[in-house]
């Protein structure tokens, strides 16, 4: 995909909201349009957005830089991680993006934050280090080669914070990998707090790749834990799976005011992607509620835009060069 200078400027103006009139969900659409370019222009424009005040947007900026997977993005991501005044949700995403880009030079920097005051930042750095180290193993190198194969049809195109467990790394799961016995084993590994987080994440993404209702139930059991990072990743996985079977637990998470904003935000966006009729009332409720945390309210706004896209028949969500959408009615 190649864009003219005029088109790039239009996307930049949308993402950075230079007019002050661009709705958040339109900024996100423009951002994901840039992400799809996977080039230096996209990195340059996305990197400018960290001056914004919106934590949700900056978290999405960091995510997109990681998914572009270009070391040119590392300086800005390192700067975000090092900034103690930045929202922890943004710093965590910067660390995760460094893991996605996966250069050995990032390991010493990530190690500096293994004792960060914020738990989600500490845990993300732990997982990112383990991922970079795994990527350098024989299994990791083989998987990297497979993921870069243009002829491959992956189950998911995302660069995940941890690979699925062996046997469920790529391609459709074999029958022996989706048995109830295997799901129970993965569930046990997912919930075992004595295991390294990286290994628990591997079980999480293996269950995602299985994708059955039983696998969804196993993943949902992870919402009972005390790690906001872990629970937010489960909600993210549900947003990839798009299984209506996950809707009840995601609504419960969104409605749970004592839950971390980071977890509720991810639950909201997952609901928007699933886009069944029953997700609309809670999303509209939390857009309108005066007591909704900013990140939760904004995530519901983005989720409603996702819902409208999924139910519109439009071909492409990342259509940031089209006319801005109208405000979402609540």
Curated annotation (Swiss-Prot):
UniProt entry tagged with the keyword Oxidoreductase: yes
GO cellular component: cytoplasm; nucleus
Biological source species: Lentinula edodes
InterPro entries: ARM-like, ARM-type_fold, Deoxyhypusine_hydroxylase, HEAT_type_2, PBS_lyase_HEAT
Cofactor binding, per record: Binds 2 Fe(2+) ions per subunit.
Swiss-Prot/TrEMBL keywords: Cytoplasm, Hypusine biosynthesis, Iron, Metal-binding, Monooxygenase, Nucleus, Oxidoreductase, Repeat
Residues that, per the record, bind Fe cation 1: 59-60, 92-93
Pfam hit, one: HEAT_2
Broad EC category: oxidoreductase
Intervals holding HEAT-like PBS-type repeats: 57-83, 90-116, 199-225, 263-289
Protein's pathway: Protein modification; eIF5A hypusination
Function: Catalyzes the hydroxylation of the N(6)-(4-aminobutyl)-L-lysine intermediate to form hypusine, an essential post-translational modification only found in mature eIF-5A factor.
Compartment annotation: Cytoplasm; Nucleus
Domain of life according to the entry: Eukaryota
Family assignment from sequence similarity: Belongs to the deoxyhypusine hydroxylase family.
Key word Zinc-finger present: no
Binding site for Fe cation 2: 232-233, 265-266
Cofactor: Fe(2+)
GO molecular function: deoxyhypusine monooxygenase activity; metal ion binding
EC number assigned by the record: 1.14.99.29
Name this protein carries in UniProt: Deoxyhypusine hydroxylase
Catalytic activity: [eIF5A protein]-deoxyhypusine + AH2 + O2 = [eIF5A protein]-hypusine + A + H2O
């Amino acid at each position: 995909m190649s864009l003219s200078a005029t088109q790039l400027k239009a996307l930049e103006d949308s993402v950075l909201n230079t007019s002050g009139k661009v709705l958040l969900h339109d900024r996100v659409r423009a951002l994901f349009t840039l992400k799809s370019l996977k080039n230096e222009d996209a990195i340059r424009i996305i990197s400018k957005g960290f001056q914004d005040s919106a934590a949700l947007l900056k978290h999405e900026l960091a995510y997109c830089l990681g998914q572009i997977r270009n070391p040119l993005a590392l300086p800005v991501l390192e700067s975000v991680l090092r900034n103690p005044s930045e929202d922890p949700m943004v710093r965590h995403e910067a660390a995760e993006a460094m893991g996605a880009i996966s250069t050995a030079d990032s390991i010493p920097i990530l190690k500096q934050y293994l004792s960060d005051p914020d738990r989600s930042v500490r845990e993300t750095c732990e997982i990112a280090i383990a991922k970079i180290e795994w990527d350098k193993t024989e299994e990791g190198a083989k998987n990297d080669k497979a993921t870069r194969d243009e002829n491959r049809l992956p189950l998911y195109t995302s660069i995940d914070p941890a690979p699925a467990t062996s046997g469920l790394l790529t391609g459709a799961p074999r029958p022996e990998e989706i048995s109830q016995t295997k799901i129970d084993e993965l569930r046990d590994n997912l919930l075992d707090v004595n295991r390294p987080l990286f290994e628990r994440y591997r079980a999480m993404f293996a269950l995602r790749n299985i994708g059955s209702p039983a696998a969804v139930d196993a993943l949902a059991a992870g919402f009972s834990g005390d790690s906001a990072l872990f629970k937010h990743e489960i909600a993210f996985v549900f947003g990839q799976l798009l299984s209506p079977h996950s809707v009840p637990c995601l609504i419960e998470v969104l409605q749970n005011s004592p839950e971390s904003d980071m977890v509720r935000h991810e639950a909201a966006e997952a609901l928007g992607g699933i886009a069944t009729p029953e997700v609309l009332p809670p999303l509209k409720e939390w857009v309108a509620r005066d007591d909704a945390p900013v990140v939760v309210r904004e995530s519901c706004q983005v989720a409603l835009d996702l819902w409208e896209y999924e139910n519109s028949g439009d071909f492409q969500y990342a259509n940031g060069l089209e006319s801005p959408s109208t405000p979402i009615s609540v």
